[in-house]
């Protein structure tokens, strides 16, 4: 028995295929989903989702930009603000964006709370894309 996994962003369906296992970046940490999982509705943080289609296959990585996941009767539906498959991300561009976002985060004034929030969001987004592309473990 397998899971039916769908990742849907406002502009496209990023993933719609069966899977043996899914790991999600929930707001409280990594969340593993296998067949027979209890019903669940959870918020997702910006991060990397990992999907394994079959037991002997490699993990597929998808960068998620926050959203929600619902698990019910071996169906995993993931609604996100944005998503990008790791195999579609240019590693060097993702590395450059990550380095730029990290530098921007380190340069923000500790007194400018709004700038800190924006820089942190940009860093999390760049880190997720870089990780999904295979740049960070």
From Swiss-Prot:
GO terms of molecular function: ATP binding; proton-transporting ATP synthase activity, rotational mechanism
Swiss-Prot/TrEMBL keywords: ATP synthesis, CF(1), Hydrogen ion transport, Ion transport, Membrane, Thylakoid, Transport
A Pfam family: ATP-synt_DE_N
Entries under SUPFAM superfamilies matching the protein: Epsilon subunit of F1F0-ATP synthase N-terminal domain
Function: Produces ATP from ADP in the presence of a proton gradient across the membrane.
Subunit structure and binding partners: F-type ATPases have 2 components, CF(1) - the catalytic core - and CF(0) - the membrane proton channel. CF(1) has five subunits: alpha(3), beta(3), gamma(1), delta(1), epsilon(1). CF(0) has three main subunits: a, b and c.
Designated name of the protein: ATP synthase epsilon chain
Species of provenance: Nostoc punctiforme (strain ATCC 29133 / PCC 73102)
Protein's gene: atpC
């Amino acid at each position: 028995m397998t899971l039916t996994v769908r990742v849907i962003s406002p502009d496209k369906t990023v993933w719609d295929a069966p899977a043996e296992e899914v790991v999600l970046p929930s707001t409280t940490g990594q969340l593993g989903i296998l067949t027979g999982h209890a019903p669940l509705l959870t918020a997702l943080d910006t991060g990397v989702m990992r999907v394994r289609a079959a037991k002997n296959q490699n993990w597929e990585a998808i960068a998620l930009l926050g959203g929600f996941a619902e698990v019910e009767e071996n169906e995993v539906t993931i609604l996100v603000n944005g998503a990008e498959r790791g195999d579609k991300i240019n590693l060097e561009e993702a590395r450059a964006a990550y380095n730029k976002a990290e530098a921007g985060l380190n340069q923000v004034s500790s007194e400018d709370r709004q700038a800190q929030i924006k820089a942190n969001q940009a860093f999390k987004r760049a880190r997720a894309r870089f990780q999904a592309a295979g740049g960070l473990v």
